[in-house]
């Protein structure tokens, strides 16, 4: 899956990755080789929790953007939340289980996928509410906070550590970071006024320069986000408020 962020100002794409799990090398001692291949990888998630996984084969993602990141890391999912299809239109196999909406995850559906690794969001309370249940069942679960490209890099780094494909971290992380730096250098210094709108099935909200990927990209390019410090836009969005602000560009995701 490829997604453009802010097409008018930044021509970079999160490129899809093909990633494979660790496999054991042939040896006379098959048991020992299998143990090496299944060695635990331990990392710290964005809640400060230590999480250990061993080549997970059945991954469930609790928000669509993390489904995307896991797929972009070359992983596969056995279960994913509804917005993986509804909002992101990800091309998932027919046998992937829909585990419910982001704010209303279905625990029964999640468990029916028989997950050996679950990925959730720090910023989504419905994800956090399930953490204790996952832990009590002995299912490894990690929570990430991805609101900017650096956060994406951090998560990608962990995902490629899990799969052992650090070449893909360079190709789809560090190389993209360089593309961003090159794009920033090309900014003409005109500092256009912009409005960034994020849409969902039930709402449209104006987003500022911080706490979201697109807002940070626009800020890096020298754009002035009219939602920054503008309560009429950020808290009570209306067509009248947009027309009054009169931005040069409007970006919608």
Regions found by a protein language model. Give the residues of each.
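Alpha-helical, coiled-coil/dimerization segments enriched in small aliphatic residues
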Residues: 84-89, 206-235
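Solvent-exposed loop/turn segments at secondary-structure junctions
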Residues: 65-68, 83-86, 117-126, 146-151, ...
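Proline-aspartate-enriched helix->loop->beta-strand connector
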Residues: 107-120, 139, 239-252
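Extracytoplasmic substrate-binding proteins
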Residues: 49-50, 129-203, 224-228
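Bacterial N-terminal signal peptides
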Residues: 11-20
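Bacterial Sec-exported substrate-binding components of ABC uptake systems
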Residues: 2-8, 22-65, 166-197, 246
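A short, structured surface patch at a secondary-structure boundary
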Residues: 63-113, 117-123
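Short helix-initiation/N-cap motifs at beta->coil->alpha
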Residues: 45-47, 96-107, 230-239
